[in-house]
Amino acid sequence: RSVIDASGTPQGSNTPRFYDDRIARYFLYPLGHPVNEMEYTHTVINNGRFNLRESHEPISNDFLKRNFKNGSKGTLLRIDDEWRFTSDDGNARQSRNADWAYKDTGNPIAYHSEWLMRSRESDYDYGSFIELTRMLDESKTDEATLNRITNPDMLALNAVVRGYDADWDTITVDRGKNAYFYRPKDGDGWMLLHWDGDRVFDRNNQAILGGRRGVNTYFNRPFIRRRMNYYMTKLLDEHTKASARTLAWMDAETAAVSGSGINMTKSHYTNWFNRREGIARNFITSNVANTSFAVTTPQAPTSKDVITLE
């Protein structure tokens, strides 16, 4: 099975470049984040014309089994808008962005329209997800609690890459959709999986993080921001502006697709690296997560050979 992407073609729905979504995966993979596979293809349906498309591996059981132990036995949620139909004919409707808001109930019906179960559907188990939203709502966000429920490194890395790309159409930046939320059966807690990152590399001044309820609470905890600072530094120092590796990769891609109708718009991305550098560096050096180290315990003398600082 595969999902077909028309980015870079006239049918691409205002997604004008072939490599936008692919570069995000290129950033994530060497930094240790699992990503799905993709390849460019020519597709034809019946007696229609050939169309140039990118075929994406779907985020489903095969992907989960390849990347995680007992992967298909984990809990996979697809993130999308919550819709409310307010007329019998369905023509009047309202929508809201998905977020990590606790809805004052443990009933999964309150959550399942924007957090769509995509594995173990018959179990219909939203317990761990609802626990996360409740903890965020009640400000029970100490490091031990969040480390138990989530995978802070993978969440921080995912948010860094999508924020750097100005991927406004996803939950950590501006829109409550276009990602998957996954909790492995064995091992670490909840993490985001990259999906549908084709509206990127355009909004120069887009903030790295958005303000979705619960999401903002999580990522602004100092120990989460510390991880984001680490991954943003790695991204900037090793994979973006003046990165020999990334430039070589783009040159190799340019050669590989020559004559195929696919364009690797290298100059657009190198210009982005230059323009985005300042905002990304400022994100790292903001005061919220860069407080100077200080020992604030009472300055009383001690005769002990070993003391514990708390």
Q: What are the language-model segments listed below?
A:
Residues I23, S55-I59, R227:
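Alpha-helical scaffold elements adjacent to nucleotide-binding pockets in ATP/GTP-utilizing enzyme cores
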Residues S2-Q11, R17, P30-N36, G48-D165, ...:
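Internal "kinase-insert"/substrate-recognition segments embedded within catalytic cores
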Residues N36-E37, D174:
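Short, well-structured active-site flanking segments
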Residues P16-R17, D21-L28:
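TRNA-binding/sensing appendages of the translation machinery
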Residues E310:
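Alpha-glucan (starch/glycogen) binding determinants
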Residues S13, Y111-V306:
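Middle-to-C-terminal accessory/interaction subdomains
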